């Protein structure tokens, strides 16, 4: 039986920008073990070399290192790229991927200056928005049993009817663990920076259209108005049940909590305001991650 997913499936061919770096080396190995079709990498200074890894079956494979994203796409047919380059080089790496018109770009890198991200996003828009960007500062995306583009542990759970979109990486893992017996179509960590590519709304819209996703779980956090905007969208566009959690109920005003985007100003951006907006849109909101998982389980089993 083939399971559907959103944005990423077993058919995607993946390249890694910065494949020779230490973090990229570790996660390339993990992605290959998870079944991801990694077809090569990019590092202009090491173009023409190869890196050796084990595939899912434990066989040694040599992955080619290319000088550019465009060349990698041309030679391998890649349609997904993952960025593992340091923050100072991230803007150029993102621009290069946009110029090559890669359909999906996952930016793992943490600590990219917000003005660099904002510049790259404007550039993508100007270029006709041919590239979907997930991140930055995120764990990426996993369609369990199919493919992993990012750093989410692949062995937590298998395929199933839950679609998950989260601002928090660690809460993504916790939610997958709590509902591991039920499984997930796709889980996306969208990142907690003030400027991100794929939003809650983008993911929720895709889950609504995905025939194999029966229930949507969204994890937000204090700061900004993304959750309020998602609530408005859900109200008019989503027929599937949605369960939510908002991290940061105990946050003091004006203090950044873990993510640069997680900051409360006045009554806007508080967890209570977000919970209220979501509940008004028919979303069941849990008080804790575990309570949220319990709500999801209860609703899913009653469908």
From Swiss-Prot:
EC number: 6.2.1.5
Signal peptide: none
SMART domains: CoA_binding
Catalytic residues (UniProt): 259
GO CC terms, sorted: cytosol; succinate-CoA ligase complex (ADP-forming)
GO process annotations (BP): tricarboxylic acid cycle
Binding site for CoA: 20-23, 46, 108-110
GO molecular function annotations of the record: nucleotide binding; succinate-CoA ligase (ADP-forming) activity; succinate-CoA ligase (GDP-forming) activity
Pathway: Carbohydrate metabolism; tricarboxylic acid cycle; succinate from succinyl-CoA (ligase route): step 1/1
InterPro entries: Cit_synth/succinyl-CoA_lig_AS, Citrt_syn/SCS-alpha_CS, CoA-bd, CoA_lig_alpha, NAD(P)-bd_dom_sf, SUCC_ACL_C, Succinyl-CoA_synth-like
NCBIfam families: PRK05678.1 (NF004230), sucCoAalpha (TIGR01019)
Full protein name: Succinate--CoA ligase [ADP-forming] subunit alpha
Gene source species: Mycobacterium bovis (strain ATCC BAA-935 / AF2122/97)
